[in-house]
Amino acid sequence: NIETERKLSAKEARAILAQAPGVQVYDNPSEKMYPLAVDAAGEDATYVGRIREDDTIPNGLNMWIVADNIRKGAALNAVQIAEELVRRDLLGVKDRTVFIKK
């Protein structure tokens, strides 16, 4: 679950997430449409579904989120490790601005 700064309805959250880069909203519980891990395998997108209000916390929402961990997790981790090696000057790269965001 997540807690937002202000109360959002599930409909508002769905609309916001639908506009987010790299996010695919796949959410129609009445038709049993929601993302499964198998849907995300080999894909760059993050899939979000089962978006609903969560009354257990203030301004809460529950949602189901799936992504390909190799593409999203491991790949990002590899980039972050490379950036840190460059930052520490451990790779002998002369122009570090190519790798490090300012």
Where on the chain are the PLM-derived regions?
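C-terminal substrate-binding/catalytic lobe of Rossmann-fold NAD(P)-dependent oxidoreductases
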Residues: N1-N62
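Generic C-terminus detector
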Residues: G60-K102
